[in-house]
Amino acid sequence: MDDDNVLFHIRTLQGNVIKSLFDCLKEILHDVMLSFGPTGIRISALDGAKVSLVHLKLDSESFEEYKCEHTYELGVNVLNMFKLLRSAGSHDSILFRYLKNDPHMIELTIQNFEKNSLTKFNMKLIEIDSVEIEVGDIEFDTIIVMPANYFQRICRDMSDITDHLVIVKKGDEVSFNSDYTCVTDFASQKTIIGDSDNGQITCNNDTDYESKFSLKYLTSFCKASGMSSAVEIYLKESYPLILKYTVGSMGALKFVIAPILS
């Protein structure tokens, strides 16, 4: 095909990571604007209820092939994208192409070089009104780095008891608590972490912290643990909570959610 007809050509060998990414995103986003540009792929979108913000940046240098001279904003349905990616295996590459003579489609190719197999899809694009929202640079009071699957287990176990997770920081100790203000909960839970293999806590000041968050959203965010060994948790009083996951070795995925005001 004439190279002049190819507006971008992007291939990664981390097909399983891309599949895991959209498996996670489909729990939070419905329709989303994918921004393909010279420096990488971006998403900046609010969920349908406008409760949480999703911010994704995949760096162009992390792809095996990346040819995209201009920026293209393409609207896709996240669930439909995952349905196409679902067949990708751990040894499959994924190729995204956008063609000048077919501007209402994005071309997606899943290829296994060992098996000499190839599956090609053409997915319809959709019209979306989207405004990009940046995550500003803020100096957070406390940063927690812990195994992503451990934080996922805390949230999953806590959701069997309560609807909300209360994060408390006092001194150099951080605890994850069930909502002790809810009289309908049949039990309470408190998990305390300090500096260890299960968590590293960086305190930029001595400010104590306590905020409450929706476990419905946190458990959805935790699906990102399938592609990230660790999660970074950013805390600052009267500010939204930020969870940061790596996307394989390709970039970072951030979730931003405001605290629940009592």
Curated annotation (Swiss-Prot):
UniProt DNA-binding residue ranges: 67-86
GO molecular function: DNA binding; DNA polymerase processivity factor activity
Keywords: DNA replication, DNA-binding
Pfam families: PCNA_C (PF02747), PCNA_N (PF00705)
Gene3D superfamilies, alphabetized: 3.70.10.10
Function description: Sliding clamp subunit. Responsible for tethering the catalytic subunit of DNA polymerase to DNA during high-speed replication.
Organism encoding this protein: Paramecium bursaria Chlorella virus 1 (PBCV-1)
GO biological process terms on file: leading strand elongation; mismatch repair; regulation of DNA replication; translesion synthesis
The protein's name: Probable DNA polymerase sliding clamp 1
Similarity comment: family membership: Belongs to the PCNA family.
